[in-house]
Amino acid sequence: EFDKIMKRGVGLACLHYGVEVPKGAPGDHFLKWIGGYFETNWSVNPHWTAEFKVLPNHPVSLGVRPFAINDEWYYHMRFRQNMKGVTPILSAMPGADTLKRRDGAHSNNPHVREAVLKRKEAQHVAWVYQRGKDYEEGRGFGFTGGHNHVNWGSDNVRRLALNAIAWIAKVDVPKGGVRPGEVTVGDLQANQDYSPRGWEPEKIESKLKE
């Protein structure tokens, strides 16, 4: 049923845990819909500070400046063969300390060690996908961050997400990107069931002003 919707050219954005589906038919559909997904025993889910030093010339990155931010950035995603139709938006080089956990479905595996520790391949943690005519030229967006709610306080993160939503909806992204508005500590704390561990409003307020 959902594939029928995708074949009408409807855009699809998947964030954080939303990019993980089982290998097989679900994963194959994600490759058709958004170009990539988190595949167990292939992809990993460490917390680390990713440094995004260069951004591509693409509507989704308009107005987004190079930045660094700590999150549970999944990486070594399973993408379409030869990255056909996939454009990386956020890419960074994970440190060796992200691969110190024992092997497991989400933690570590020989494939990711080969890619990062030996071949030194930068890892794509946000990307866009242009579907073909069989899907009415629909568009997809994948973003592996989003575990740390406080990161929505970052203008760069909000602008990138808003740009992506506009792009997959086939709306022209403004030259400077979609305006992300202003977010306060109070906004970030609103409607949460409880304050996250280590929640320090003054520190967060200071970071938002940087």
Task: Identify the role of each PLM range.
Residues E1, E72, L117-K118:
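Generic detector of contiguous secondary-structure segments
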Residues E1-G24, F143:
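Short alpha-beta junction capping motif
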Residues M6, V10, I34, F38, ...:
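A generic secondary-structure signal for well-formed alpha-helical elements
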Residues K7-L12, K84-T87, E136-R139:
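Loop/turn elements at helix/coil->beta-strand transitions in domains of secreted/extracellular proteins
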Residues T98, A105-E210:
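Extracellular ligand-binding/catalytic regions of CAZymes and related secreted enzymes
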